[in-house]
Amino acid sequence: MKLRKTKFFSQLKHQVLTANQKPFLFYKLTMIGFVGFIILLQVFILRNALNGEMDNTMVANSGFINIYVIRNKGVGFSLLQNQTGLVYFLQGLLSVIALVFLVFMVKYSYIFWITTLAFGSLGNFFDRLTSANDSVLDYFIFQNGSSVFNFADCCITFGFIGLFFCFLIQMFKEFKHSKNQ
C-alpha cells in the first residue's frame, strides 16, 4: 500500500513538473496574474460602484444590455437561493477544480479560458464572502430579458464556452491527423 502511495505521489510530482517547465510556467503565471487581477478588479470596482443602488433599481437603460441592480443569494438564475453553505461549496469547488486543471494543463490554448473560469468563480466567491448578507450583486440584464447577472458570471460563462471550442478544435485536429496517417 505504501509503495502505491509513493508511486502515485512520484507520478503526480512528475506531471506537475512536466506541465510547469520554465517558459510554460511563466506564461501560466502571467495569465494568472494579469487575467486574475483584471477580473477581480472589475468585480469589486463594479460592486463598489453599484453597491449604493437600491435593490431592484434600474440604473441605466442603454438598449441591448441594461443595468438593473439586485442582490442574489443563489447561483445562476437564483437557484439554491436559501442554501448558503451549498452555494459557497459549489463556487469554491469550481474554483479549486479550475485551478487544479490549470496546474496540470499543458496546452497554451486552454490556459486563458481556465484562468477566466477560475477567477470568475473566485470573483463571485469573494463577492459573496465580503457582502454583509452572503449575496452577490447582479446588475446586467438583456433588453426584454429576465436573467440578471454580473461580470464574474460572464467570465464563468465565457470560460466554459472558450474551453468547449478549444476542446472541439483539438478533437478536429486529432481526427484530421489520425485520418492523414
UniProtKB/Swiss-Prot annotation:
Record's bilayer topology term: Multi-pass membrane protein
Molecular function GO labels: aspartic-type endopeptidase activity; endopeptidase activity
Main location: membrane
Pfam families in alphabetical order: Peptidase_A8
Keyword Calcium: no
Reaction catalyzed: Release of signal peptides from bacterial membrane prolipoproteins. Hydrolyzes -Xaa-Yaa-Zaa-|-(S,diacylglyceryl)Cys-, in which Xaa is hydrophobic (preferably Leu), and Yaa (Ala or Ser) and Zaa (Gly or Ala) have small, neutral side chains
Uppermost EC category: hydrolase
Alphabetized InterPro entries for the sequence: Peptidase_A8 (IPR001872)
Localization terms from the record: Cell membrane
Active site: D138, D153
Transmembrane segments: 25-45, 86-106, 107-127, 149-169
Gene Ontology BP annotations: proteolysis
E.C. number(s) listed in UniProt: 3.4.23.36
Pathway where this protein functions: Protein modification; lipoprotein biosynthesis (signal peptide cleavage)
GO cellular component: plasma membrane
Keywords: Aspartyl protease, Cell membrane, Hydrolase, Membrane, Protease, Transmembrane, Transmembrane helix
Matches recorded under HAMAP family: LspA
Family annotation (PANTHER family): LIPOPROTEIN SIGNAL PEPTIDASE
Family that this chain belongs to: Belongs to the peptidase A8 family.
Role description: This protein specifically catalyzes the removal of signal peptides from prolipoproteins.
Official protein name in the record: Lipoprotein signal peptidase
Species annotation: Mycoplasma genitalium (strain ATCC 33530 / DSM 19775 / NCTC 10195 / G37) (Mycoplasmoides genitalium)
